[in-house]
Structures are given as C-alpha cells and as structure tokens.
Amino acid sequence: MSFMVTFMVEADPIGKGRPKFVRRGGFITTYTPTKTRDYESIIKDAAKQAMGSSEPVETPVTVAIYITVPIPASYSKKRTEACLSGSERPTKKPDIDNIAKCFLDAMNEIVYMDDTQVLTLHVTKVYGTIGMVEVMVKEDFD
C-alpha cells in the first residue's frame, strides 16, 4: 500500500529560529523561540488534519515543500509584476532551509516517526500575492 499526504499552511512562511539560552540559577537552559513554537503548532495542526486517523509512517519518504512568500507592499507595480511573472525571485529572508527545517521537525510523530526517514527533499520558494506553504509527503520507492 502506498502512502501520500498533502496539506497547506496558509500563513506567511517563518524559518526555524535558533534555540535561545538562559541562565536560571546555576544552570543554563535552552528553549525554542515563541515565534517558531507557534508556527510549528500551526504546521502540526494542518498535518494532523491531513493525516486524519492514520498513524505516522515508518518507511522512507520523499518530501516536497512549495513555499510562497508574499510580495512586499513597498514594491512598485512594475516590480510586483516582475515578482509574479517569476523574473524576480525571492532571495531575501526567511532562508529556504530554515523554513524546510521548521516543517520537517513539526511533522515528526505526526506524518512520519522521525525526519531521519526523509531520503529526498524538494524545496521551492517563489513570490505570490499571499504567503503560504504547500507540503506533499509520499513513500520513497527505489
């Protein structure tokens, strides 16, 4: 039986933030930034809804992530048209790898058991009128 799940997060993409360190008493503890934690929660909710009652897969998977970043409001009409036509590409933050990491981590124990199962990863970042991320996960066949 083959496995495939797709879902969409209709929110501006956010890259995974670096862990923060704080001294409490004589100990140093780490925590995930609130912005990252909140965004991962949105991803988890979308993934859970897409999975329904299905259990996480334990086989190797291929993941495709299609990132649409919103065109800045400050761009001129001409520049906006260039963004929508694809002649101007989104080379600014958030970084594509940090967005992917946020999604891969959030899908742990929901879509697959662990992101070490991801053998193939396709990530694309483009401009669009609204920010969103589309994800497809399927079994990886040789």
Features from the language model and the residues they span:
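Acidic, proline/glycine-enriched N-terminal capping motif
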Residues: 1-142
